[in-house]
């Protein structure tokens, strides 16, 4: 019941006080709380309990940028301005390459820096995808052997297979216009969507329709704006799959 939920939420503070320490609670993919039944009521309860705690800090992270922004930067949501909002940068290619090569070596397998770099480029350095693709490549390499382009190609195919059910789910309800818009981005159009040539080539309808498409695809977290007026696909592997 209601009291039990509050007791559970108060637990970290009680433990921290009794042990005389400070606790940091980390919650990943926090935006999924938005899918709970009666989510706003639950968010209000969380906030009301958490904001009274002085021995516990909360680190809430999520991969869906638009949903996280909405929860913490929209005045209509309980967690509005609840804490500091940080955008995490991707891990650098140099660090990834070093890490991938090291992990291969430590298990008696080998991969060239060049191939490790290709893993970073295919995945656009998205941590979960780098791990997944490197793992598929690693699986295919025999002990004491060196990874090849062939292994990488195999790894990419396995990664696409693994992601396919999710990608089908993400795209099956999209309109023809929305799919056309995504294909425009995948084909290298990142700005100037309302130019006549682009509207016609990709069958995007009217300039007003483009504004609606942008908004709807951002809400679905399928596209992102990393720089002013520059649109990109949010998910590099979804882009590869749609190709």
Task: Describe the predicted segments one by one.
Residues 12, 28, 88, 119, ...:
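Conserved RecA-like P-loop NTPase ATPase core
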